[in-house]
A protein has these predicted regions:
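Secondary-structure boundary elements
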Residues: 93-174, 182, 254-256, 280-286
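Hydrophobic/aromatic-rich core segments of domains that either
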Residues: 146, 152, 178-270
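Hydrophobic/aromatic scaffold residues of ePK-like serine/threonine protein kinase catalytic domains
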Residues: 275-277
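A broadly conserved detector of short glycine/acidic/proline-rich loop/turn motifs that flank catalytic sites
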Residues: 26, 43, 75-77, 200, ...
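A mobile, often basic/glycine-rich helix-loop segment
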Residues: 293-295
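Linear, non-domain "peripheral" regions
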Residues: 1-125, 129, 134
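Glycine-rich, small/acidic residue-mixed loop/short-helix segments
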Residues: 20-26, 30, 35-37, 239-260, ...
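Catalytic-core signal marking the mid-to-C-terminal active-site face
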Residues: 288-290, 305
Length: 307
């Protein structure tokens, strides 16, 4: 798997500071066999640490003039086939535990509003139809997932990272990040711990078409705590599925801002353009069935004026 981000500046930038959430973790559903991070131009050092939520992050700075920057994270990941869930506690049981403060802190912290997911009565009402009396939490969360998939339209031009959740709910258009926020807001409104998950989604080409390198996607979904036995269970409202073998988890937090793949500050540089390419490829497909150098459907052109 490769995640490549390239920046080009119209004028030389003098300084750049960057914080990366690009290290794929080993979890109960995936294991990482290899990871490499490269930055061009090469910084003097790249520092790694674990953040508050347990994600591994990297920091680096460029202090020499540069006209562009490329960050590439490459991972080899084994994704396990999930075990089907046949039973789960009722959502009321879990909500009652949350009220009694019996959840450990690492779970309880996901009960509360966050910067991008505030208390919204409309989301409380939205979730009530799924969370009926004595309903198992997994069943209820799956219905919420289906409702979001049905009620919201995917539109990459409708929102950006600064669009308030209130506007997303009002217009019912957005992208995976927005749909994850809607689900988390509805779950927290029922007293259930829910967190934001960033990651990747492997896509399949249309029948008869070659697989395009770079055509996979950065992705996001939500996770709900389903008790000590099941732990965190992930749901993808963009695709109306429980997370499976095509999903690779990257990081988790309260909302998007906690786990943005790349955060940084650049001094100078004038106008900049950014291009992102993501490729998730089975190992047995690396030598055939792909079209190298194809334009990524996930590539973005972004221009902004640095101050």
């Amino acid at each position: 798997m490769e995640h490549k981000t390239a920046y080009q500046y119209s004028e030389p930038a003098s300084v750049a500071h960057n914080l990366l959430h690009l290290r794929v973790p080993t979890t109960h559903r995936q294991s990482v066999e290899d990871f490499a991070l490269t930055v061009e131009p090469k910084p003097r050092s790249v520092v790694s640490r674990t953040d508050y939520f347990g994600n591994q992050v990297h920091y680096f700075a460029l202090s020499e003039p540069h006209s562009g920057m490329t960050i590439t994270a490459t991972s080899r990941v084994v994704v396990k086939t999930p075990t089907p869930i046949t039973t789960s506690p009722t959502w009321e049981e879990l909500a009652a535990i949350g009220k009694s403060r019996e959840f450990p802190l690492e779970v309880r912290q996901f009960l509360f509003p966050s910067r991008h997911i505030r208390v919204m009565p409309i989301l409380s009402e939205y979730g009530k139809s799924a969370f009926t009396r004595n309903r198992p939490i997994v069943e209820a969360a799956m219905e919420l997932t289906t409702r979001i998939y049905t009620d919201y339209k995917y539109d990459s031009n409708a929102t950006n990272i600064f669009t308030p959740l209130e506007e997303v709910v009002r217009q019912r258009h957005g992208v995976c990040q927005d749909f994850a926020h809607v689900g988390i807001g509805a779950l927290r409104a029922q007293g259930l711990p829910a967190r934001y998950v960033s990651g990747y989604l492997r896509t399949e080409p249309p029948p008869g078409k070659p697989r395009l390198v770079g055509a996979d996607a950065s992705h996001a979904w939500f996770s709900v705590f389903c008790g000590t036995e099941l732990g965190w269970v992930d749901f993808d409202p963009t695709n109306n599925v429980m997370v499976g073998t095509d999903h690779i988890t990257l990081a988790h937090g309260r909302d998007f801002e906690d786990v943005s793949p790349i955060q940084g500050v650049v001094m100078g540089g004038g106008t900049r353009a950014m291009q992102v390419g993501v490729d998730v490829m089975p190992l047995d497909a690396k030598s055939h069935g792909t079209t190298p150098g194809a334009t990524s459907s996930q590539q973005q052109q972004q221009r902004s004026q640095n101050k």
